[in-house]
A protein has these predicted regions:
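Aromatic "clamp/platform" in nucleotide-sugar-dependent glycosyltransferases that forms part
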Residues: 382
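Carbohydrate-associated surface elements
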Residues: 229, 251
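Conserved donor-binding/catalytic core segment of Leloir-type glycosyltransferases
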Residues: 285-301, 307-310, 327
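N-terminal subdomain of nucleotide-sugar transferases
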Residues: 15, 29-119, 478, 482-485
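Conserved acidic donor-binding segment of nucleotide-sugar-dependent glycosyltransferases
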Residues: 414-415, 419-426, 435-441
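Short alpha-helical donor nucleotide-sugar binding micro-motif in glycosyltransferases
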Residues: 361-362, 369-374
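Short hydrophobic beta-strand element within catalytic cores of glycosyltransferases
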Residues: 390, 399-402, 412
């Protein structure tokens, strides 16, 4: 197998950024976020007992920290995935140490995220002002930091390496080779898939990423795909060995994302409108059609499609203007339409600025309330490996209007828990929004079905399946080592 050595110089040719000073505000936010996460440690399900599981896993997330608020910068579904999975693995006695790049000089070397889950900050490149596109040049420094942390332990400290996203995969490849441990990798997104589904004005993924992902696929002992379609894409685009690919659906925190906040469920015989209660808490009009966008503001997520669809709807049905409200909850990320001001200007040009409300990213508890309050969550994405937000909204009792791309057809049952649209024609989305406006009973009917559908996506099941993948990877790695040594 080709060794990793030549890869880092290739990746290092990308541009570098200037160094900025760390801000104490980030440290404060990280501290608050960790304290919130640490208050919950889910109990292990009795059935999640696996034979010869790993004792300790090194999890790698180079470009985004699990301590960052989802919806800001490059923090999104992958952050939620890592946090929830790590906590559930710890609950079944698999310790997890997460290595991530330090983005502030004042961060401690390590932070306990939850019992059995440790986050290690690695110094690699400037703390701030470093775009994700510049990170390949810092992979050598990040790898050095990971090796330094490992050097303080006895051999065999980590039973397995689990890397997330292609940048982490290269570090994981080197670490796994050095430690004599198996490598499990999760792509989360793939360059070839993204490039085949680019939004207008978006930047194609570079050839270096395609080469890097191909090498990681070949080097991994096991690959985790969110859906069967993603597994097929790994085989079709990257020549992955089908025997090494395992499908594990991500989960949803069913304690947090539920029709009623925990502890507020109505008693026997009591009738309470969960949507009305959420709207009252958020100060939203009770009788409005509320199509919600929640996520990072970037071309890939296509929030502009929602705005254009609303403009089409109001052109056809101007009387709806007085009873429609379009919240856009999220922060800037990526390229092209990265700044909220770009969407604000678009709303003004379309003549709908009066019905659109831009809100910054919110914590998970308040996000759940936004889901409960919405008539429908709108996800017109050009590419989604799974779409955690779709499952979270459904768990909260809200239907989803989504593009029929990636894992969204798995997350959303078309016609039952929401609607899927082929392509990205705003008029097609406008037609579905008109259905919700003309048939108010659609939201509660589909919302009830959505909440039931989401029950099958718990994180305990995802952790159990992931632990099975770990066990298979360890056994395969041991067999390969034995065969190489006669």
């Amino acid at each position: 197998m080709e060794r990793l050595g030549p890869v880092f110089p290739l990746l290092g040719g990308w541009r570098s950024s200037s160094v900025r000073h760390a801000r104490s505000e980030e440290e404060r936010l990280v501290s608050q976020y960790v304290s919130r996460l640490g208050r919950r440690s889910p109990a292990a399900s009795p059935r999640l007992r696996l034979h010869r599981r790993p004792r300790r896993v090194a999890m790698l997330s180079v470009h985004t920290s699990p301590l960052h608020q989802p919806g800001t910068g490059d923090a999104g579904g992958m952050n939620v995935y890592i946090v929830e999975l790590a906590q559930r693995l710890a609950a079944i006695n698999i310790e997890v140490e997460i290595f991530t790049r330090a983005t502030s000089g004042g961060l401690p070397p390590s932070v306990q995220l939850a019992p059995g889950v440790l986050v290690r900050h690695v110094d690699a490149g400037p703390y701030e002002g470093l775009a994700k596109e510049d990170l390949p040049a810092q992979l050598c420094a990040f790898t050095h930091g990971v090796m330094q942390a490992w050097a303080g332990h006895r051999p065999g400290h980590y039973d397995l390496v689990h890397s997330h996203y292609w940048l982490s995969g290269h570090v994981g490849w080197l670490a796994a080779q050095r430690w004599g441990a198996p490598l499990v990798h999760a792509m989360h997104t793939m360059a070839k898939v993204k490039n085949a589904n680019l939004a207008d004005g978006d930047t194609p993924e570079p050839a270096a990423r395609v080469i890097g992902e191909t090498q990681i696929v070949a080097a991994s002992d096991r690959l985790i795909a969110n859906t069967a379609e993603e597994a097929d894409e790994l085989v079709r685009h990257y020549a992955a060995d089908p025997a090494k690919v395992a499908v594990v659906h991500p989960g949803v925190n069913l304690d947090r994302f539920r029709p009623f906040p925990k502890g507020t469920e109505p008693g026997p015989g009591e009738r309470v409108d969960a949507r009305a209660a959420a709207r009252a808490r958020l100060g939203l009009p009770q009788d409005a059609l509320i199509p919600l966008f929640a996520g990072r503001i970037q071309p890939l997520k296509a929030p502009d499609i929602l705005l254009r669809a609303v403009a089409v709807l109001l052109d056809e049905r101007p009387e709806l203007r007085s009873r429609i409200l379009v919240p856009v909850v999220g922060g800037p990320s990526g390229s092209g339409l990265a700044k909220p001001e770009g969407l604000q200007k678009l709303a003004a040009r379309l003549g709908i600025a009066d019905v659109v409300r831009f809100r910054p990213p919110v914590g998970q508890e308040q996000l759940a309330d936004w889901f409960r309050a919405a008539s429908v969550l709108v996800m017109p994405s050009y590419s989604e490996s799974f779409g955690l937000v779709a499952i979270e909204a459904q768990a909260a009792g809200t239907p989803v209007l989504a593009a029929a791309v990636g894992g969204l057809p798995v997350a959303v049952r078309d016609g039952h828990t929401g609607r899927l649209v082929q392509g990205h024609d705003p008029a097609a989305y406008a037609r579905v929004l008109r259905d919700f406006a003309d048939n108010p009973e659609l939201t509660p009917r589909m919302g009830d079905a959505a909440a039931r559908h989401a029950q099958s996506f718990g994180w305990d099941s995802a952790a159990a399946a992931t632990a099975d993948v770990y066990t298979a990877a360890i056994h395969a790695h041991r067999r390969r080592v034995r065969s190489h040594h006669g």
